Amino acid sequence: MSVFSQLAESSKQNPFSLPVRSGNCASAVSAPGQVEFGSGKYYAYCALGGVLSCGITHTAIVPLDLVKCRIQVNPEKYTGIATGFRTTIAEEGARALVKGWAPTLLGYSAQGLGKFGFYEIFKNVYADMLGEENAYLYRTSLYLAASASAEFFADILLAPMEATKVRIQTSPGAPPTLRGCAPMIYKAEGLTGFYKGLPPLWMRQIPYTMMKFACFEKTVEALYQYVVPKPRAECSKAEQLVVTFVAGYIAGVFCAIVSHPADTVVSKLNQDSQATAGGILKKLGFAGVWKGLVPRIIMIGTLTALQWFIYDSVKVALNLPRPPPPEMPASLKAKLAAQQ
């Protein structure tokens, strides 16, 4: 039985979707002693893995993120990574490099909950809707649809803290702490101040997440098929986690490229309360939206690899089922053989 057959079967017990029918998960997916695949507990643990993977990694790279944002909003002053670090330390001291750590931790933990938790749910539900054979044939489209759906909701959780973080990091007059800056934004702009950056945030994060999940899933599939000298089932958990890290880094490089223009707009938009996305794009031009791409590739590549590594490690630690790369269903093999 293929992984998507197992996904479809386990989705029948999914408590989050009424149309899904009842069924039992194959033992190949949920081994004895493991959390039941597709259960509410499984999704809750996946969401916890997302909280840890996104919250920890984004908070760890706050200094690089701060410099990246400053390059985007003030490229005349912050001309590069090294210059950005030197200028920030010289003018504000080393402690300034961790500005925005609190909204980063809270915002991206919430986003990770939605990103990974909802992805697992949507992937299972969409696989059940497609059926076993179509879920295999159109698995890339399934990954793209599930990740886009998950990120749509995850960004609603992220937007308020992202707006606060960027204001702290890039606006000289803004309070340097979450408890000081968030009330200031609310007093001056109301709830709109926290969510005015949501559309460009979707523009940045949805393509990013679609690339992140689809590229990761396909890269893992390719690595086990063409690079790793033995089947996944014969690899140790440590070896599997190495494959996860490599696939995550490759996915991260592509993620950074497809989402960078929108990331620049988000940074500019949250810096200036009077700015609009259209006005920023017109002012920056094509070349301007690519400012800060190199540090973002370094940041996002490392970030994505670590996120997948942490997420997969959480699954291992919590004894969650980790289905192998998909295989062609036996029914589809029979149809193809009959056509030859």
Curated annotation (Swiss-Prot):
Residues 1-27 form a transit peptide. The chain crosses the membrane at residues 47-67, 95-114, 141-161, 200-220, 241-261, 297-317. Its main location: mitochondrion. It holds the Pfam family Mito_carr. It comes from the Eukaryota. It is found in: Mitochondrion inner membrane. InterPro entries: Mitochondrial_sb/sol_carrier, Mt_carrier_dom_sf, SLC25A3/Pic2/Mir1-like. PROSITE patterns: SOLCAR. One of its GO terms (biological process) is phosphate ion transmembrane transport. Solcar repeats lie at residues 41-125, 138-222, 239-317. It is a multi-pass membrane protein. Keywords: Membrane, Mitochondrion, Mitochondrion inner membrane, Repeat, Transit peptide, Transmembrane, Transmembrane helix, Transport. GO terms for molecular function: phosphate transmembrane transporter activity. GO terms for cellular component: mitochondrial inner membrane. Transport of phosphate groups from the cytosol to the mitochondrial matrix. Belongs to the mitochondrial carrier (TC 2.A.29) family. This is Phosphate carrier protein, mitochondrial. It comes from Caenorhabditis elegans.
